[in-house]
Amino acid sequence: MFILVAISIDANDNRRHVHVFYKGKRHQHSLAKIWIEANGQQCVEIAESSLSAKDNEMLVAAINRHWEFINEQVTKAFNGEKTISIDIEK
């Protein structure tokens, strides 16, 4: 349904975040930007979104459940390392 992406050029933003895209679409634009931390601590919040409230709630809950893995992948992306992806249940 969705794919979360850490974009390495965003490494200097003031808060770590992921961008949300529809999975499998060719011409994509970010549907949402979700912060995953504040001051180095887990804090998942919608920064901006064109998704429904239901989708936003589902994404925030999923990111909270898998925060350690997602944060690790963001670190790897920002360091230019290979990242891996997993399917996450709603």
Residue ranges and their predicted role:
Residues M1-N12:
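Betabetaalpha-Me/HNH-type nuclease active-site subdomain
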Residues L4-A6, V18-V20, I34-I36, L59, ...:
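Generic hydrophobic secondary-structure signal
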Residues D10-K54:
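A short, structured beta-strand/loop element
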Residues E48-E89:
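Well-ordered alpha/beta subsegment
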